[in-house]
Amino acid sequence: MRAFLIGRWQPFHKGHLEIIKKISKEVDEIIIGIGSCQKSHTLTDPFTAGERMMMITKTLENYDINYYAIPINDIDYNAVWVSSVESLTPPFTTVYTGNSLVRELFSEKNYTVKKPELYNRTDYSGTKIRKKMLEGSDWEHLVPKEVVKVIEEIDGINRIRRLSEKDYDEE
């Protein structure tokens, strides 16, 4: 059985890894959708699809998990989004998502939809991790070591800090 899991992975963290490890015990292959792949260089989506692909693939090299990582664009027409996903991915029968819109769209197309249990959401939240990066707090323990290396390679911390700067002083 092949399943689809979509996320923004901004950044890929240990909570994501635990969800993927759990799903991998239930299915033969996982299609990891890199959602909102067209978005980058913002405070909520600082990393490019390619950078997120590196985070995921470099991390999963260390695990016996069969997967495909595929960039998935947002489109402005929800009724055809599932068809767009289907055109970009190998066939799958099951969708794992915690997003109510994604759950509804795939349910309407008769997919089996499962809601994965979040792993320690208190600590493992992309929003909280990005905030820690911005503030200079410790964040490295919340992501796999391979993700730390990717973020260092792309100078991701300084990118986030530059993105938070105002263009002009406000009086």
Swiss-Prot record:
Protein localization: Cytoplasm
Q: Which UniProt keywords apply?
A: ATP-binding, Cytoplasm, NAD, Nucleotide-binding, Nucleotidyltransferase, Pyridine nucleotide biosynthesis, Transferase
Q: CDD domains under this entry?
A: NMNAT_Archaea (cd02166)
Gene Ontology MF, one: nicotinamide-nucleotide adenylyltransferase activity
Q: Name one GO cellular component term.
A: cytoplasm
Record GO biological process: NAD biosynthetic process
Q: What class of enzyme is it?
A: transferase
Q: In which pathway does it act?
A: Cofactor biosynthesis; NAD(+) biosynthesis; NAD(+) from nicotinamide D-ribonucleotide: step 1/1
Provide the catalytic activity annotation.
Answer: beta-nicotinamide D-ribonucleotide + ATP + H(+) = diphosphate + NAD(+)
Lineage top rank: taxon: Archaea
| E.C. numbers | 2.7.7.1
* Similarity-based family: Belongs to the archaeal NMN adenylyltransferase family.
Could you tell me what this protein is called?
Nicotinamide-nucleotide adenylyltransferase
Instruction: Tell me which species this is from.
Output: Methanococcus maripaludis (strain C7 / ATCC BAA-1331)
